[in-house]
Amino acid sequence: MATFEKGKVFNENAVIDYAEGGVVSKELIHNDSGSVTLFSFDSGQGLSEHFAPYDALIQVIDGEMELTVEDTKHVIKAGEAFIIPSGARHSVNAAQRFKMMITMIRG
């Protein structure tokens, strides 16, 4: 797994590895304004339905994910993004393994 430093170029896909049968998260930035977090999901993993207090920008960086927002399923592939509105019910399913970066800005 690669590392990263502020002020230096890094490959976000190389910063986080997959864990067999699991979900891995790595927070890149966290401050009073918001957070940027990388996640990797192995096949068959997911997150049950929940709400976020702020808009969330999801960027898939490897594989493809299934995101259900307010009962509508979306398939998002590497290189694609989706903004989840604040307060929207959503869940995540990994039909195949994938990595994503989520950016949440408080406001």
Where are these regions (language model features)?
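Short, conserved beta-strand element in jelly-roll/cupin
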Residues: 40-42, 52-67
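Ligand-binding loop in jelly-roll beta-barrel domains
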Residues: 86-107
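A cytosolic small-molecule/anion-sensing beta-strand core signal
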Residues: 61-62, 77-78, 96
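Conserved short histidine dyad/triad with adjacent acidic residue
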Residues: 22, 37-52
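Structural motif
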Residues: 35, 64-66, 73, 89, ...
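A short, N-terminal "cap"/entry segment at the start of jelly-roll beta-barrel domains
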Residues: 1-33, 68
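Short acidic-glycine-tyrosine-enriched beta hairpin
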Residues: 71-86
